[in-house]
């Protein structure tokens, strides 16, 4: 029997969500363009979800869609839409509406305690990470014992440790673990992210640039402190 030409599988991806708080298309376009210009390697042509929960009913979706795409972002879905007329306009644009409603509650699966004295897997990179490279540590921590160039990307489901100059992007807790942290001996990143909460380079406090720093989430907000 021949193999099927296609196969459908469930998967998950880390996507940025753009929350629109203003219905003026030009204001939105300019604000997004500034963000894209700050981190073009990360945001140019990036897939995003647009959250329209705070937009007034009757906002011109066609113009807002054009404003977002003109800034260089690629819309993959819309969330937070409650207005029926807006929903119809979004559907006519050929974009999917993403539901954020509460699903049916399932009985929790029994928790199985992991065996004791089993070491946690860690991915270790001993060489420089060049521009354009992406390193992904699935279900584990990532340690880089070298420099990370601008345009390079580190992704880990666990913590990220960089023992060198960090000029690229670091995304810890990629699977959603808000307890993950980023440790860096020389911070100069284009972007840092933990469980989807991120800072672009201009949001990192200036006094920490080039310094040893630890980043973590506190009350779902990125927090930074010196790494002693």
UniProtKB/Swiss-Prot annotation:
List the Pfam families hit by this protein, alphabetically: MinC_C, MinC_N
Q: Does the keyword GTP-binding apply?
A: no
Task: Work out whether the entry's keyword set contains Lipoprotein.
Answer: no
Does the entry annotate any disulfide bonds, and if so which pairs?
none
State the SUPFAM superfamilies in the record: Cell-division inhibitor MinC, C-terminal domain
Q: Which family does it belong to?
A: Belongs to the MinC family.
What exactly does this protein do?
A: Cell division inhibitor that blocks the formation of polar Z ring septums. Rapidly oscillates between the poles of the cell to destabilize FtsZ filaments that have formed before they mature into polar Z rings. Prevents FtsZ polymerization.
Q: What is this protein called?
A: Septum site-determining protein MinC
Origin species: Yersinia pestis
């Amino acid at each position: 029997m021949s193999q099927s030409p296609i196969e459908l599988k469930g998967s998950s991806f880390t996507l940025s969500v753009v929350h629109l708080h203003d219905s003026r298309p030009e204001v939105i376009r300019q604000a997004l363009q500034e963000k894209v210009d700050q981190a073009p390697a990360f945001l140019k042509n990036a897939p995003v979800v647009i959250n329209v929960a705070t937009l007034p009913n009757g906002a011109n979706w066609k113009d807002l869609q054009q404003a977002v795409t003109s800034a260089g972002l690629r819309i993959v879905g819309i969330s937070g839409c409650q207005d029926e007329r807006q929903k119809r306009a979004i559907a006519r644009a050929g974009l999917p509406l993403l539901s954020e409603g509460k699903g049916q509650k399932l009985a929790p699966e029994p928790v199985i305690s992991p065996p004791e004295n089993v070491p946690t897997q860690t991915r270790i990179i001993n060489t420089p990470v060049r521009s354009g490279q992406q390193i992904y540590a699935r279900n584990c921590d990532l340690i880089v014992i070298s420099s990370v160039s601008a345009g390079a990307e580190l992704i880990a489901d666990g913590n990220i440790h960089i023992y060198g100059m960090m000029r690229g992007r670091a995304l810890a807790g990629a699977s959603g673990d808000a307890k993950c942290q980023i440790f860096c001996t020389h911070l100069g990143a284009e972007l840092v992210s933990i469980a989807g909460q991120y800072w672009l380079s201009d949001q990192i406090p200036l006094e920490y640039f080039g310094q040893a720093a630890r980043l973590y989430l506190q009350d779902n907000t990125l927090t930074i402190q010196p790494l002693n």
